[in-house]
């Protein structure tokens, strides 16, 4: 038997044969090496303190049974000697598994085992980590023993003197390094030595060890991730059944969890409120309205939360460990779990907060509980209610809050009027309730108080500055505010109050005994009885100023009020922070991590688990944990209208759909934008195809298409064009303005297409010249392009001679175009067509002409640029055919002979004549290009000349009073009449400064002279310039760069001098010259660097300091000097001090000089514009040889594609559209006169029509059939092709326009069905129409409303709004009813502004609240109090919630609201408790557009939801709470959940669903 076997036999009490068996098979010899003290017993579990002073507690006792025979490889000797990877493979039985040990990816052995008495240890999660910790700790212990053995050997005496080993491979150093590495891992744990013992009864080996946690008691512990993970897995009590009790749905794949939260709260509220025994009377004193039963339930719940009926008997004297956990979680911080000690451990168990790391003993927790109970008994610790009243909108949350205030008023003792807070501020206890609400409903709160509880004394707090106007001190303001029962303020005011709330005068350092000012907010010096946040979701995040200020305010009770308190995951932190639920109101942010993890999972489309759990520092945290907090601590209740329908009696709300058709002008405008979208997105008209754009791009286009359904001009387009019309921004764009805009857009596009076609043609010819080297072919191409350009300029712009020097190409000058730019009318061979095409003189004709002139100048300028390029390249072609041949002959002859070449000896006579002719043509074409270049640049050159002339006039030496140069300061530097050293020092400083300023003046004026020479130089060349230069403009442009750089540098240096001069004149501290005189990173030219180095800048003591010292000296002198010398001394000091007045004059003078430099800067800007245009011309002439191979290939592909017919088709189509648009005004009149537009082929009515370039109209199908067989117009016989056809929709009949909404549409019914989108769930369009009709009612009087006459048209939707308002007003007058009041909701602020202008035009009194400003509440209050105000314009997102507007019986939803909650909020403004009449919602929709697609698709989603509910056996009721019983996956039923953006899976349907 080996020695090791004997050791094992003795220590483990087993037979030697068994030990030798294991040793022979390589089982445990290396294990024994790692465990040097096998004969020691395990560490006593009573050990309490670690070596570093931290306390210890046993967190895991591991006993693993291993079979007697182990299949072990030779590598198994590495166990515990090196860090190993351990994997646990679970077996069928919970306490059995397979242990897999590997090292360096090599499997060492597998052991089947089972756990003994370790039910808390999760085999699959905890055990691998625990074993890994054990391996680390035992290896560290072995290495420390090894190191100690080496040291003990070195300490033995030796006769030989050993040298100190400095080798980096020294074993001792390596050991220390390895020990250090191991000590950094799992530093929060200690592990006992591993003990092997043999169990004779089970014939197994048992591996045992204890794992202990090192911790600091009554302190925050920063545990490692591994420590938190083991503690969380071992001790966290996660009761899944508790959650499922109130929440029936699996979890979602989205951050948007509003429906899930409210579904849970509704379930909880039913259970919680049913347990409350009613105790409120039927009528509440001082409340002028009786509460409904469900309202009494809510008030009773809040009263109980605030301590009603609670007595000390409710708090037991002694509580167990479970009770302590609940107490600590509710009253201190959420997250405490119990770490129980094992029976053989000494000491109390621990409470560990998994979110903060704080640990305390159960004894300490019991002490805190006893202290709390004692304070409750003495009244020092009142019950502090925290909660959210989340009643559905319209159920009377305001009345419930007022009832709470009336029923539970604070009783204060005079002896306890104040207390000192943690920041040493004196806080006054008050009876007051602080209500914070949005601006929009602040007045509404005051009205409700006056109407229902006018015994309550209230005050509107408007901020620190306002209240301090009436109070002398902050303490006085506090005493004044304490007198009120209610203080009402807004979120905006609270946000501005945050800095005053943070101010603390008790910690301000000061030299005086009492502070001069106190900027403390009076709100921060009061302890309110309760704070109520109405629409609490308005806090948005805990980092906003409103949230910060609210958190600083002292209160007893904390309430939030909102119908939708939780919308997304991050709202949990906002609500919990406001309710002061620790640790969520502190820095630890588990919720943000959870939100980000879910976002990442969604982006990866990882939906493998319904309940997503994230880990923060090893601690598990999920949405379930967030939701559980609310019912675990009774934080929120809610009633829905569906639940209390039997108690409330709200009259019916009618939901009308108003389908409208575009007028022909609007329809063409929409189709043009739609076609642009299709072209850019890659979709086909039926929704097929592969999009090439992002979802953000699609959302942007959807927004544009939705806006154009409301008004045909985008705000930015309208603004730009009205500015061109001399700034008439207040003018409303009517339908004629829209037509003008459409024509201008079409004409602008046509110019672009023509420009592109000619440009590509020039590049094609240039390719033939430079790359193909075929000058003869290139010559032919360029001549054709030149001729085509000349014809185009003559026909399109009526310009006969492009070389006319009087031609005006300026786009920005105010003078009108010459008559040469007048439009030519399209001729036609038919009299009726000429009558249609004959334009009327409309009121906006001048505006049309001005915009047209602007665009035509722009187009002519583009064509002139192309003509210039063409002439230049023609010169290049003739150069290749003429001059270049002579140059090649010269070069060849120069190499062979010295004498000059005789060209007649080289070329035949006829060829030489041809060369000479080509040389003359070369010069002629280059000259023509130069003339055109000057003509193109003439407007920019004129601007430069005008600005130079203006500057010369302003700065004329004899007539100008405008300062440009600096002036010297006169000063006597020699005679110093100072009476003392102080004055003398001032004299010398002043003398030095003035001397420096005068030198600086000289420096400035010299630079200015240099600037004037350069800046006054003209930009264009004279007629004597060599116009035959082939590189036109290159030399000029090169010179201009140098000139512009000099001007820029000089202007910059002059400004630096003025700035330095201002500092010397006005600074109160020492002036320092900046290290960098120009911004860092700026490119500095050599010339600019020289200028900067030559600047004369002044540093040191400024003038103001000198004058201050001089004044101080005079004060001292007056006290000490005699009267005899007073007069002389004073005169000298006064002489010096007069320069103080002079310095102020110099500062003003510097300001005037700076303004003068701005005039010179305008010359620089004008020159820059000129040279930029010159550079663009030069860039257009770049040789193709300078392009890279990919660039050249791309150019060739573009030429082949575009010139192959694509551009011609676009040009033909848009020319036909221009003719159509020109005739639309006449067609509009035809429609108004009830005339019919007939097709000349089939003689039928034109509905879906087409127009060709000659201006004739036909049915679309007729003309397409005709042109397939003919190439001429059926009427005028003019040539035309299919590419010239422009299609349009034209409906005349009112009956067709207002088809019954329930009728099925058959056109294109299947267009969207082939799409693979899974949301296209209804294939039968008649079923879609049925769903559409089920949700909305039909307004049967819609035709009568259409017949109402209005004096001007602004578009289909705006026109009908005006007509419907007029109809409602006339109807109310006939019925002797009150005048109607209407709320107009839209998501487009700019559209509401347009509506407001139209309402004003028709004398319809209205008010607008487009954003949540300070006066919005007053505006809404005026609407409620003044029946004469017909309309209130509101923005859906900013003012859709919280308003009580039951005075308005009508709500206009001007455009589809994407988010269901926002839509219901808007519809609920008048459909609430207190409404005694039927109300009406009018949904405006433009047929055959994205608006109709959106509304239809929302109906389909509702049907899908209804079907899924029916499958689950749940009853679906449309009247139910909008968020009750919803499917948990919101993305399936919500088109939009954030900021009116459509989610990815619904985008396609919004564009194409049900499209024709």
Swiss-Prot record:
Protein name per Swiss-Prot or TrEMBL: Uncharacterized ATP-dependent helicase IRC20
Keyword entries, A-Z: Acetylation, ATP-binding, Helicase, Hydrolase, Metal-binding, Nucleotide-binding, Nucleus, Phosphoprotein, Stress response, Zinc, Zinc-finger
SMART domains: DEXDc (SM00487), HELICc (SM00490), RING (SM00184)
One term of GO molecular function: hydrolase activity
Main location: nucleus
Residue numbers carrying Phosphoserine: 810
Family listed: Belongs to the SNF2/RAD54 helicase family.
UniProt biased composition (Basic and acidic residues): 145-156, 817-827, 834-846, 1297-1309, 1508-1518
Induction of expression: By heat shock and UV radiation.
GO BP annotation list: DNA repair; double-strand break repair via nonhomologous end joining; double-strand break repair via synthesis-dependent strand annealing
InterPro entries in UniProt: ATP-helicase/E3_Ub-Ligase (IPR052583), Helicase_ATP-bd (IPR014001), Helicase_C-like (IPR001650), P-loop_NTPase (IPR027417), SNF2-like_sf (IPR038718), SNF2/RAD54-like_C (IPR049730), SNF2_N (IPR000330), Znf_RING (IPR001841)
Misc. remarks from the entry: Present with 143 molecules/cell in log phase SD medium.
Keyword field contains Glycoprotein: no
Residue ranges, annotated region (Disordered): 145-170, 810-850, 1297-1319, 1508-1534
Positions of the Helicase C-terminal domain: 1363-1531
Modified residues (N-acetylserine): 2
EC number assigned by the record: 3.6.1.-
Species assigned in the record: Saccharomyces cerevisiae (strain ATCC 204508 / S288c)
Subcellular location: Nucleus
Ranges annotated as spanning the membrane: none
